[in-house]
Amino acid sequence: MAKKKIAISCGDIQGVGLELILKSHKEVSAFCEPLYLIDGELLERANQLLHNAYETKTLNTLAIHSPLPLLNSSTIGKVSAQSGAYSFESFKKACELADDKEVDGVCTLPINKLAWQQAQIPFVGHTDFLKQRYKDHQIIMMLGCSKLFVGLFSDHVPLGAVSQLIQVKELVKFLLAFQKSTQAKIVQVCGFNPHAGEEGLFGEEDEKILKAIQKSNQTLGFECFLGPLPADSAFAPNKRKITPFYVSMSHDVGLAPLKALYFDESINVSLNAPILRASTDHGTAFDIAYQNKANNKSYLNAIKYLA
């Protein structure tokens, strides 16, 4: 069977993305046919910063129609509008190739959200762009590994705004889409307030979550969704034995325990998108850029998921 062709967007070149590309190419090529969406000149510069430790001539690259950002010892680890613009164009090209069926999937390396903002890109990040590009799809951010998956009802949203987003109709739509995409038999849903609201004592959000769970289970015809569970104990070992699938109302409630337990191996997946997209679960790691310290386990797992 022919290997799948995977478009790999470069991420922010001032971070660990190019190190991951170079150090992992041999392993990645065992699983798929990688197409790196980056100008070869930038990979050469990256390799020089890494003391020419890697082979670059065998990598299949595709030039990006965007001005080349500076990449040298004085720019690495720093936010740059030019690097932000370049990483966005690399990602957008990957999506275009996937839309045109020229590649089988998209793997995205970490971007810097402030760099995107400085480049006046009107999206918070990868998932926000996908939600705008594919408006007819209920795209869900899910992170995890085989031991634990967490779907986020809200992702890159200020915590103070999450409460207003918790509405029964929207949550039912989300829960059903999550179950359809994952085919999970049991999903544990984290509550929003302390003690999952203590039966309405601490706000009304958890009552809405309960109603959404009941309506979703009724639609499915079986008790798929459990909760709302008090979030402070939802990820205890005895709870994780029930199912690896969780839903969190907010970003950090779900991802803090996931990353405490399985940070190195977890990946980020865009559920319900018309294209296959996966990513590392970590950021640009500017503090260790070009020091040959980047852990590539999450990146390799993202590739394996797509392949």
From Swiss-Prot:
Catalysed transformations (reactions): 4-(phosphooxy)-L-threonine + NAD(+) = 3-amino-2-oxopropyl phosphate + CO2 + NADH
Superkingdom, natural source: Bacteria
Keyword Glycosyltransferase found: no
Binding site for substrate: 126-127, 259, 268, 277
Organism: Helicobacter pylori (strain HPAG1)
Enzyme class: oxidoreductase
GO cellular component, as recorded: cytoplasm
Keyword Oxidoreductase tagged: yes
Miscellaneous comment text of the record: The active site is located at the dimer interface.
GO BP annotation list: pyridoxal phosphate biosynthetic process; pyridoxine biosynthetic process
E.C. no: 1.1.1.262
Amino-acid positions noted as binding a divalent metal cation in the UniProt annotation, renumbered to this chain: 156, 195, 251
Name assigned to this protein: 4-hydroxythreonine-4-phosphate dehydrogenase
A UniProt-annotated Pfam family: PdxA
SUPFAM superfamilies reported in the protein's UniProt record: Isocitrate/Isopropylmalate dehydrogenase-like
Keywords noted in UniProt: Cobalt, Cytoplasm, Magnesium, Metal-binding, NAD, NADP, Oxidoreductase, Pyridoxine biosynthesis, Zinc
Protein's cellular compartments: Cytoplasm
Similarity comment text for this entry: Belongs to the PdxA family.
